[in-house]
Amino acid sequence: MKPRLIQTFLPDGSLEGIKVVELSESSVKAFVVPRIKLNELRKRQEINQPSLYLLINSADNQLYIGESENFFHRVKNHDQSKDFWDLAIAIVSNTNSLEKSDIKYLESLAVEKAQKTAAMTVLNRTIPARNNVHEFKVHTLEKMLEDIAILTGGTLIAEE
């Protein structure tokens, strides 16, 4: 493995608030959002694009993986319909270049990998169908998933 730089930005200056995490030479970044800070996320334009997201129950080591065209709207729905989680992580493109089919493909890869590695109890009942993406994109999306594993500390979608 080669050296990588991870940068974390604290928009409100607090470790208990939202964190924006970027990885050198990566086309994705992560928004780490405590459930109690959801409304503060409304100010961030980047989360209004297609995203892969993780809902996490820190106490019980549980994980739900999903995809959305607009993370903020989706997570607000989950705020009312899913009680188990206390932390959300949204993975978005730095260039707003991910399409719905790309995100669905990433979701399928992420659920499959998370279920295999058993880093956390995965609450997804099934592995989403692997969406058809252009063969030129497959390598890029698999590389993104490797970056996502690093951005999430390797514990959510762990290395095999």
Language model region names:
Residues 53-55, 62-69:
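GIY-YIG nuclease signature motif recognition
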